[in-house]
Amino acid sequence: MVSKTASVIFTIEQINDLHARLGSARTLPEYVLALKGLGVERYDSYVADGHSEYFGQGGHRVVSPPVHEVLPVAETGQRETFLQHLRRHERHETTYLEMSRGLAMSGIEKWTVETGSMTMTFYDKAGREMLVEQIK
């Protein structure tokens, strides 16, 4: 008999498969729901090199490899500049790498997606919340 509290163990291969199918701004809600279905409770994506860390129950964690060259992240978060870069990307005016460069110049260290609350939070290097968005 399997315990109802048993942890769901997901792999980086499963996440990569979902990302290949649903990993775009247009399909973000479906992507996050699919991650939740795998057992991912939260993930952090780091602007400096594009790697992500995925967390599940019982301390389960998997890490993706870097996806681009290392970008220097500004020491101080600049909210208005950050929002300009983010909005340009949301309008499909920039590539992922161009957005990442803009976020790094704006002092954004990472974003965190919570699959339960369907939120995405952007943080600067000091750990300050720069923006919390509902994923819809």
Locate predicted features.
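Charged, low-complexity surface segments at secondary-structure and domain boundaries
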Residues: M1, N16-D17, V67-P72
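Short, flexible domain-boundary/linker segments around small modular repeats
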Residues: V2-Y31, K36-G37, G77-T94
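Short, solvent-exposed interaction modules
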Residues: V62-W111
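Short glycine-rich, low-complexity/disordered patches
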Residues: A25-G37, Y46, R91-M118
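Glycine-rich, aromatic-bearing surface loops/beta-hairpins
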Residues: F122-K136
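Long, charge-rich, low-complexity intrinsically disordered regions
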Residues: V2, Y43, V67-H68, E133-K136
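Acidic (E/D-rich), amphipathic helical modules within compact regulatory domains
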Residues: E30-V70
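Short acidic-glycine loop/turn motifs at beta-strand connectors
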Residues: A48-D49, G56-G58, G116-S117, D124-G127
